[in-house]
């Protein structure tokens, strides 16, 4: 019963004409009906519906929530999670757009990535340019992209948020309610200050981390979905090691939005390893965790189905190995005490059908073509 309640809470859409939320059966039907319209050939539709309804197998919960017009408009909304490094100014607005689609973001602020960012201007000047923010996910992301581009050139624009619908207004296509203009105002002001403090140099790892966390903060306010983030950093990065030390929740509340992990690229010596664990203990936050990239590459090579020559990252739950700019295609088998070998084989087959269908959802509207390329190559 609790599982059904959680599924209804997270995935059922509001039916305004009937003044109620979908039932669990209606949610499942909407997903499977969307799937059947997209896939040619014979599918075990009735069996898929029964298995999802009875919580034997599960598709992507994001696809379950958005199946229909929202998912048709942009397939980004069909994926639970993603990963990208902050190696280009576009990383910021891509992360924003993906989070606004309800998809979690793993990101890296390791030095080999943030060192690829351009230098920030030496001086800043107020300009008469006004960024008019359109009232959509695309409008928000484009406006933030424009802001970041101008700040890199030392120009501080004005912005007009008058077209953004008020907080609490219903989002008819995507579901949920609007954040309102206030969180966006806060993000823009925060970003301006971070760039001004970085004048004449590149953004540091902690500055990039804070901008992404602040982006996630505005999505939480919207009530669309609680933003999920994981931030990877170098083992030797003292600033990121201390990101959640002291009273960080007073001066840097945005850091609560991300779990933090050190990316291990080789076996550290005992001294470095113990320093990291001492810092974890002293912080009382349980962070940083460990992401072993070297091990991830070895696992990929051992399985023999994927190209191991990538600097892999991971999703916020750290349950999947992802390329630079790739989405996590998730389907699940729910194992019960009553299962035997045959029933498990049947469940795995059905979950595979769901995952195969979801892998065809590569119509991404805003992000770079690399996302589609990676998803298609690893289908």
Give the role of each language-model region:
Residues 1-379:
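Extended catalytic cores of very large enzyme megasubunits
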């Amino acid at each position: 019963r609790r599982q059904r309640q959680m599924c209804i809470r997270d995935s059922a859409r509001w039916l305004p004409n009937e003044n109620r939320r979908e039932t669990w059966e209606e949610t499942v039907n909407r997903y499977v009906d969307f799937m059947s319209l997209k896939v040619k050939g014979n599918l075990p539709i009735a069996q898929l519906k029964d298995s999802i309804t009875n919580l034997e197998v599960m598709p992507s919960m994001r696809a379950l929530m958005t199946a229909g017009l929202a998912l048709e408009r942009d397939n980004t909304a069909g994926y639970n999670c993603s990963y990208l490094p902050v190696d280009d100014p576009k990383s910021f607005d891509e992360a924003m757009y993906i989070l606004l689609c309800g998809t979690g973001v793993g990101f890296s602020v390791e030095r080999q990535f943030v060192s690829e960012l351009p230098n920030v201007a030496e001086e800043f000047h107020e300009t008469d340019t006004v960024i008019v923010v359109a009232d959509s996910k695309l409008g928000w992301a484009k406006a933030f992209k424009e802001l970041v581009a101008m700040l890199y050139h030392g120009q501080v624009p004005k912005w007009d948020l008058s077209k953004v619908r008020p907080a609490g207004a219903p989002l008819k296509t995507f579901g949920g309610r609007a954040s309102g203009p206030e969180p966006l105002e806060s993000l823009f002001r925060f970003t301006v200050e971070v760039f001004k403090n970085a004048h004449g140099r590149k953004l540091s790892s902690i500055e990039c981390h804070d901008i992404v966390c602040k982006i996630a903060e505005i999505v939480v306010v919207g009530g669309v979905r609680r933003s999920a983030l994981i931030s990877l950093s170098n083992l030797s990065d003292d600033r990121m090691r201390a990101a959640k030390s002291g009273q960080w929740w007073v001066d840097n509340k945005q850091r609560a939005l991300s779990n933090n992990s050190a990316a291990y690229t080789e076996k550290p010596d005992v001294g470095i390893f113990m320093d990291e664990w001492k810092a974890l203990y002293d912080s009382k936050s349980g962070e940083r965790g460990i992401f072993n990239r070297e091990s991830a590459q070895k696992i990929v090579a051992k399985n023999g189905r994927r190209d191991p020559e990538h600097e892999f990252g991971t999703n916020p739950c750290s349950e999947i190995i992802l390329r630079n700019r790739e989405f996590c295609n998730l389907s699940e088998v729910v194992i019960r005490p009553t299962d035997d070998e045959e029933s498990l084989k049947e469940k795995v087959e059905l979950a595979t059908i769901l995952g195969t269908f979801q892998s065809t959802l590569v119509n991404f509207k805003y992000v770079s073509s690399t996302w589609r390329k990676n998803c298609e190559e690893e289908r």
